[in-house]
């Protein structure tokens, strides 16, 4: 019989130690002769607060109620489980009880609860620790209830794979960081959080050659909340007995308590590889996968043949599957608010560390044009670095990691980070080998939009503003809600003197991204060109608050205020009423030609077809360029004026600037007429 099996048959000190760590109901604490009231406390809570948390009321409340003080009888597993030396039976109503063992309870001071780090839930401002009160003896409650920071996890090896239930309140550690003495990777450059220096007991245990004793020392460190030291000792135990699944399962619990769920999954899979029938590892894997939002993988390990699944986890799995199904249906029809609602419900159900669910929420925000929320949401997802070797989980028919990257790429593109978007979507293609149509579509779209933007930038830089506007327009045909492309095209219109169009595109960009500073700057400048000083002042005042140290914004605001003040004192000159005015006398014609700025005269006849055809376009130009004076002269009604101006053919257009004629055109095209107006306007 192997070394790690023999302890289940020997009534030794090891067995007694294991039994002393079996967390049963609190009302059976009468048969433990060496019982002492101990409170290891939370590794994240000051010692001074431990007494309050150790009361019976506290032990039966939310965060510490994940099984240790439920008052419910334990359910014995039907699975014929092997007793692996040193696997702590833990804090679960469904933990198997060794035949013949004495049921014991712990007083409130000896309370133990699952500790697996702080669940990360996106609440609209990124991932954040979520605390809740939950009177149920099993965790997984919603994060919507009020926090109870006084009741904290105490850091025991977790039961039946139940690594952590949602709603565990935590506080930031104030312990110093020290370099780890071990050789394994403990994250963050081997800098670990401890209570100070590595304890002498830990150093001594690390030098032992008995893997069981090393493991026991690791368990002690775990219960004290010293997860880094516990990991170092479990590593030592594994190096002495590599094929012991209990050691790897315990290490998985410590990793999960440190918030390193993916590595915990890897360790559990190693435990299952060592012993495919090891129930505890399967249960722990199921619980981890539930937190990661991977329903299929969770079901695979929760419903192992011959194993009675934990009913709480089974219910959580079924609820998660329901929310994912409803989310998928809502996404198909574009009901993005329902998508957000179902994702929030899935997270509250326990999938509190799922990158793909947070990415789905980010996608919904993006489709609702809430780009800031989408960016905050997607940036809360940690760097993808999956370790497990299970068949990759899929969401909406896409491998989860690839889906996350696709959403990140689309958010990057919406914010103008085109190069980053291409890198991410290409990486998604390497992950999803099934060539999902959705991933392929995102890849093609991102590349084509980026190409249009690059082409537009090149044309703009060379001064070919009209062609650049067309290039940006091509990109907008592929991505109609890209605020960057709208803002870039607005710059083209501004350079062409088409300020009304510039304002329109800036408005589009700001509808999509209300905090887009560059679009607001461009719109304010366009308002100034149009003489809409009141609107310009309003935009510059917003910019002044957003950019308090920007001297150019301050100067522009002052100029706009001065112009607004002067405008109220200016006389209402002929031609500034945004409509084409009629001129019928020679005197009025001379007055109009002497107006400041540009004056355009349209010599027409109501009986001439060409004149009538171009008249609506002249009205459009009048609205588009409000600083230009537009006039019309009916040659049939004003024969003297037509003769004085030598009008031979109609329609004829004459452009005056500062009282002098600068151009005359006969039967011009729409493009030639507008180009001529903008040329002299600039």
From Swiss-Prot:
User: Which residues, renumbered to this chain, carry the PTM Phosphoserine?
Assistant: 8, 42
What CDD domains has UniProt attached to this entry? TRX_family
Q: Which UniProt keywords apply?
A: Phosphoprotein, Repeat, Stress response, TPR repeat
Q: Which segments show compositional bias classed as Basic and acidic residues?
A: 16-39
Q: Which Pfam families match?
A: Thioredoxin (PF00085), TPR_1 (PF00515), TPR_16 (PF13432), TPR_6 (PF13174)
Question: Which top-level group of life is the source organism from?
Answer: Eukaryota
Concerning what turns on (or off) its expression, the entry says: By salt treatment in cotyledons.
**Phenotype of null mutants:** No visible phenotype under normal growth conditions, but mutant seedlings display increased tolerance to salt stress at moderate NaCl concentrations (120 mM).
Show me the TPR repeat boundaries: 211-244, 246-278, 280-312, 402-435, 449-482, 483-516, 518-550
GO terms (BP aspect)? response to osmotic stress
Q: Which GO terms describe its cellular component?
A: cytosol
User: Disordered: where is this region?
Assistant: 1-120, 132-157
Domain Thioredoxin residue range list: 587-674
Q: Compositional bias (Low complexity) spans? A: 48-71
Tell me which InterPro entries the record gives. Answer: Thioredoxin-like_sf, Thioredoxin_domain, TPR-like_helical_dom_sf, TPR_rpt, TTL1-4
Instruction: Please tell me in which tissues this protein is expressed.
Output: Widely expressed.
What does the record give as the function of this protein?
Answer: Involved in osmotic and salt stress tolerance. May play a role in the control of meristematic cell size during osmotic stress.
The cross-references to PANTHER family, in alphabetical order and at most eight, read: TPR REPEAT-CONTAINING THIOREDOXIN, TPR REPEAT-CONTAINING THIOREDOXIN TTL4
Q: What is this protein called?
A: TPR repeat-containing thioredoxin TTL4
Give the organism, scientific name. Answer: Arabidopsis thaliana (Mouse-ear cress)
Give me the gene this protein comes from. TTL4
């Amino acid at each position: 019989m192997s070394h790690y099996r023999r302890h289940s048959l020997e009534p030794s000190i090891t067995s007694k130690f294991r039994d002393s760590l079996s967390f049963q109901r609190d009302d059976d604490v009468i048969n433990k002769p060496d019982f002492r009231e101990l409170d290891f406390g939370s590794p994240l809570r000051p010692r001074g607060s431990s007494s309050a948390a150790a009361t019976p009321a506290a032990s039966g409340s939310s965060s510490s109620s994940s099984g240790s003080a439920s008052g419910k009888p334990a359910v014995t597993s039907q699975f014929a489980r092997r007793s692996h030396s040193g696997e702590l039976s833990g804090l679960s109503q469904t933990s198997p009880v060794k035949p013949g063992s004495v049921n014991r309870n712990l007083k409130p001071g000896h309370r133990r609860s699952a500790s697996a780090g702080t669940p990360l839930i996106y609440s609209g401002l990124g991932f954040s620790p979520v605390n809740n009160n939950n009177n149920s003896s099993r965790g997984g409650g919603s994060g919507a209830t009020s926090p109870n920071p006084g009741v904290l996890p105490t850091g025991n090896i977790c039961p039946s794979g139940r690594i952590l239930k949602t709603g565990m309140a935590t506080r930031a550690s104030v312990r110093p960081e020290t370099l780890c003495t071990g050789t394994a990777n403990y994250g963050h450059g081997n800098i670990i959080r401890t209570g100070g220096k590595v304890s002498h007991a830990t150093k001594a245990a690390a030098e032992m050659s008995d893997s069981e004793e090393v493991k026991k020392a690791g368990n002690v460190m775990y219960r004290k909340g010293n997860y880094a030291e516990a990991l170092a000792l479990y590593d030592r135990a594994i190096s002495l007995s590599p094929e012991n699944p209990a050691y790897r399962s315990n290490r998985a619990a410590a990793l999960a308590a440190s918030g390193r769920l993916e590595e915990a999954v890897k360790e559990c899979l190693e435990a299952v590889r060592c012993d495919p029938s090891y129930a505890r590892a399967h249960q722990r894997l199921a619980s981890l996968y539930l937190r990661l939002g991977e329903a299929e993988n969770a079901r695979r390990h929760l419903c192992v043949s011959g194993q009675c699944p934990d009913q709480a986890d089974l219910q959580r799995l079924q609820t998660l599957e329901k929310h994912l199904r409803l989310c998928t249906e809502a996404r198909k029809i574009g009901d993005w608010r329902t998508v957000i609602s179902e994702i929030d419900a899935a997270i509250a159900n326990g999938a509190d560390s799922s990158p793909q669910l947070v990415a789905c929420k980010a996608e919904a925000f993006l489709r609702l044009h809430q780009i800031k929320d989408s960016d905050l949401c997607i940036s809360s997802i940690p760097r993808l670095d999956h370790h497990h070797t299970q068949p990759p989980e899929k969401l909406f028919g896409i491998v989860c990691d690839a889906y996350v990257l696709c959403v990140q790429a689309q958010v990057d593109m919406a914010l103008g980070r085109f190069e980053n978007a291409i890198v991410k979507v290409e990486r998604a293609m390497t992950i999803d080998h099934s060539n999902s149509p959705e991933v392929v579509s995102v890849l093609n779209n991102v590349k084509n939009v980026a190409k249009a933007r690059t082409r537009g930038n090149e044309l703009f830089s060379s001064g070919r503003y009209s062609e650049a506007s067309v290039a940006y327009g091509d990109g907008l045909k592929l991505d109609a809600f890209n605020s960057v492309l709208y803002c870039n095209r607005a710059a083209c219109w501004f350079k062409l003197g088409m300020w009304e169009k510039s304002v329109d595109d800036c408005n589009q960009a700001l509808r999509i991204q209300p905090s887009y500073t560059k679009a607001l700057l461009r719109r304010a400048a366009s308002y100034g060109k149009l003489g809409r000083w009141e609107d310009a002042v309003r935009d510059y005042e917003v910019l002044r608050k957003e950019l308090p140290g920007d001297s150019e914004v301050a100067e522009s605001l002052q100029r706009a205020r001065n112009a607004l003040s002067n405008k109220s004192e200016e006389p209402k000159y002929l031609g500034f009423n945004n409509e084409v005015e009629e001129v019928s006398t020679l005197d009025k014609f001379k007055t109009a030609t002497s107006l400041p700025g540009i004056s355009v005269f349209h010599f027409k006849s109501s009986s001439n077809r060409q004149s009538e055809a171009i008249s609506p376009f002249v009205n459009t130009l009048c609205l588009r360029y409000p600083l230009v004076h537009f006039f019309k002269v009916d040659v049939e009604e004003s024969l003297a004026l037509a003769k004085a101006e030598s009008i031979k053919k109609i329609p004829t257009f004459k452009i005056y600037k500062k009282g002098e004629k600068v151009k005359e055109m006969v039967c011009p095209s729409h493009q030639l007429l507008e180009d001529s107006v903008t040329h002299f306007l600039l």
